Each structure stands twice: as C-alpha cells, then as structure tokens.
C-alpha cells in the first residue's frame, strides 16, 4: 500500500515539477517589452536575457548526475523547485538589470537540474512506461508553458498593471511544486518507490555511472545533442521573441500573448501523443521530418504575412515545438540501462543547451540593427534544416551501448 501511495505521489510530483519548468521563461516573453522599458534594456541586452536559459541549463545540467548520485534525484529535484520559487520571488524586485539576470539564473538553475533528471526518474521508476510517462510530464510542461503565456498579460493588468507583480505571481505555482518532493525525500532512498529495475543499483537514489561509454565518440549521442540544441534554440527564440514579432506586425500585446499561448498549448495533447507514438517506432526519423516541415511552413508565414495568418502560424509553430518531447523520448530509448540514460540525458541536454546559446543572442543583435523581424525569422528557419538532419541521425534504431560494442 505504501509503495502504491508513493508511486502516486511521484506521478503528482513529476506533473507539478513539469508545470514549473517554463513559466519563468514564457511569462517574461509575454512582458518583454515592459521589462525592457522598466530596466532600460537595449535589444542586445534583451538578446542576452533570452540566452540566459540555455546557458544555465548547459552549465547546471552537467552537474545534475553528480548531484543526484550524491543526494538522490528526488532531493535534487526538490532543491530545484525551491530554487525556482526563490528566483521567481526575487527577480521582479531585484533592482536593475544585473539583479534581474542573477535572480533569473537562480530559477533557471532549478529548472536545469530538473530538466536533466526527469528522463532519468522516468526510466528508473517506470521502465516499461517510458513513452506514457514522458508524454505525461511533457504534456504538463506544455500546459505550464501555455498557461503562463496566455494569462501573464491579463493577470498583470488585473493586478494593477505592474510587470513586477505579473512575473512574481508565478512563484505561487512553484511553491506547490515543492510540496510532493518534500514528502518523497523524507522516504528512505530520498527518491521514490522501488521498482523491479532499481534493485540492482548500487545507489539508493540513482545508478552509478555507466562504464565504458564514451559519448563523445557516439554518433547517436551527438545526433541527440545537436537535435536537442537546435530545437531548444527555436523554442527559446519563440518564447522570448514571438510576442514581439506579432506586436511589431500591429497585433496588440494581449493578442500576441494569446498567440504564444496557442503555440504552447499545441504541445499539451501532442506532447502526450508523440512520445507514445515514437516509443512504438523503431526509427523516429519520419516524425522528425514532419515536425520540421511544420516549422518551416510557420516561419514562411511569419515572414510573408505575420498578421494575416497569425493563428495558423501559431498552430504550426506549436506542432514544430513538439520536437522537445520527441527528444526526451529518444533519450530514454537510445540507452539500454538507467545508468546509460543518466549520462546520455546529461550529455544531450547540457551539450544541446550550449549549442542553443548563440541563437537568441543573434536574434537580439539582428533585431536591434535591422529594426525588424525579417532576418531573425529567416535565421530561425535556417536552424531547422540541420535540426532535421541531426534528428534523423538520433532517431535510428540503435543504442549508445550498441555503438560502444561496434567500436570495440
């Protein structure tokens, strides 16, 4: 009975954690113009601001496996939720640009370690339901992203019109995300219920490092890292700049936020369907291509008719952004062991986020120097081409252990 209760608590914890992994970013995107005015930011500095998420995800993502082995994944995710809460509370009232960036980094540190450990926890405690559980928390992640994009502007207006209040209120959701993990870390093993696959692990919290795996020599690992990095580039540019692109086309701030919400809410059903579908396929390349073509169509529409077809472009971008749950699913499928997934998740996500850092910076610079969205949109479309190539490589029916044996 206790084991069943802990399993349910773990599912609740995964869902609430996932709900908190994007509001810190999408709420800022909805109010970016107001934040820029309030903090006197240039376009280039705003580009730096939208590059902070992937930088923090890369930096702290590399540390996640070591922290999880030391303290247990549940304790690390719990600490991550606390960091998100603290960062969201402090950020709006931190003073100038430097304080705003520092508080954002605290929240993003918590998001980073949780990002890496989600596939690990799913593989460890739900080894026979990787697609289903990945879909569940990906759906929750998309829901949190969409809700933050949709309600931040109207909620800010309802609370008095201050962007500081509109950003800070998301700390309430983060507090809720802490609660189930506090219960989980109090249990022996500081993680969650046991599973058949976990009894052979030398650590109560997480498998020991997989020996003999040189991910730097694995085409699959690099394919996943590049695919993850390029889809993250598009996602963070979308979350940071899409409302501004629509506002430049003459669309109101509230409607621009709703358009971003439509993009994000597309991930709610698709983030559940795509992982389940991908888990049943030996090769995920066709899904990669289909999502990429949706993205290219959306960028073409944004370039030639941003206002006239705004809702259609938002829907197509939302479909394209489901490359994220697909990447998480492939991480869980491209290793035979929990220990391998730990290393592959950290490598693919941290390396991927490093790859994604220049994208938002380039968009900010191009936006400032051209005064329009044309070149940034063209750049975003260009990124999709290597993303599709990398995704096809990552989607092949092989594991990192298979590649290691072939090299030996």
Predicted regions: what they are:
Residues 128-129, 136-189:
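Helix-loop-helix hairpin linking two adjacent transmembrane segments in secondary transporters
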Residues 103-141:
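Cytoplasmic helix-loop-helix junction between adjacent transmembrane helices
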Residues 59-98:
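Conserved MFS/SLC helix-loop-helix module at the cytosolic interface between two early adjacent transmembrane helices
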Residues 28-29, 219-262, 267-269:
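Extracytoplasmic gate region of multi-pass secondary transporters
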Residues 335-373, 380:
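A late C-terminal transmembrane helix in Major Facilitator Superfamily
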Residues 284-327:
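C-terminal transmembrane helical hairpin of 12-TM major facilitator-type secondary transporters
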Residues 40, 72, 93-98, 127, ...:
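Helix-breaking motifs and short loop linkers at transmembrane-helix boundaries and internal kinks
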Residues 1-4, 186-224, 408:
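Juxtamembrane intracellular "pre-TM" segments in multi-pass secondary transporters
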């Amino acid at each position: 009975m206790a084991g069943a209760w802990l399993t349910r608590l773990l599912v609740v914890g995964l869902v609430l954690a996932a709900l908190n992994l994007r509001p810190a970013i999408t709420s800022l995107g909805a109010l970016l113009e107001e934040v820029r005015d309030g903090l006197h930011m240039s376009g280039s500095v705003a580009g730096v601001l939208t590059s902070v998420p992937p930088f923090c995800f890369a930096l702290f993502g590399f540390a996640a496996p070591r922290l999880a082995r030391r303290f247990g994944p549940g304790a690390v995710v719990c600490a991550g939720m606390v960091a998100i809460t603290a960062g969201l509370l402090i950020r709006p009232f931190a003073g100038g640009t430097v304080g705003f960036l520092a508080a954002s980094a605290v929240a993003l540190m918590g998001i980073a370690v949780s990002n890496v450990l989600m596939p690990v926890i799913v593989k460890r405690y739900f080894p026979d339901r990787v697609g289903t559980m990945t879909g569940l928390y990906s759906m929750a992640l998309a829901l949190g992203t969409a809700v933050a994009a949709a309600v931040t502007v109207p909620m800010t207006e309802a609370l008095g019109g201050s962007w500081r209040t509109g950003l800070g209120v998301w700390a309430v959701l983060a507090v809720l995300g802490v609660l189930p993990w506090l219960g989980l870390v109090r249990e022996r093993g500081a993680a969650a219920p046991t599973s058949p696959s976990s009894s052979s692990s030398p650590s109560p919290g997480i498998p020991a490092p997989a020996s003999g795996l040189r991910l730097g020599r694995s085409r699959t690992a690099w394919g996943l890292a590049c695919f993850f990095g390029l889809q993250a580039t598009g996602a963070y540019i979308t979350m940071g700049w899409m409302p501004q692109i629509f506002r430049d086309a003459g669309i109101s701030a509230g409607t621009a936020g709703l358009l971003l919400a439509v993009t994000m809410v597309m991930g709610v059903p698709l983030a559940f369907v795509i992982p389940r579908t991908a888990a049943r396929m030996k090769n995920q390349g066709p899904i990669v291509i289909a999502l990429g073509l949706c993205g290219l169509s959306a960028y073409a529409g944004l370039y030639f008719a941003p206002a006239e077809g705004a809702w259609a472009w938002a829907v197509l971008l939302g479909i394209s952004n489901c490359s994220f749950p697909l990447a998480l699913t492939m991480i869980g499928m491209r290793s035979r062991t929990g220990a391998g997934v730990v290393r592959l998740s950290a490598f693919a996500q941290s390396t991927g986020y490093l790859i994604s850092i220049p994208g938002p910076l380039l968009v900010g610079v191009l936006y400032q120097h051209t005064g329009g969205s044309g070149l940034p949109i063209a750049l975003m479309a260009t990124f999709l081409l290597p993303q599709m190539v990398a995704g096809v490589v990552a989607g092949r029916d092989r594991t990192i252990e298979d590649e290691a044996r072939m090299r030996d």
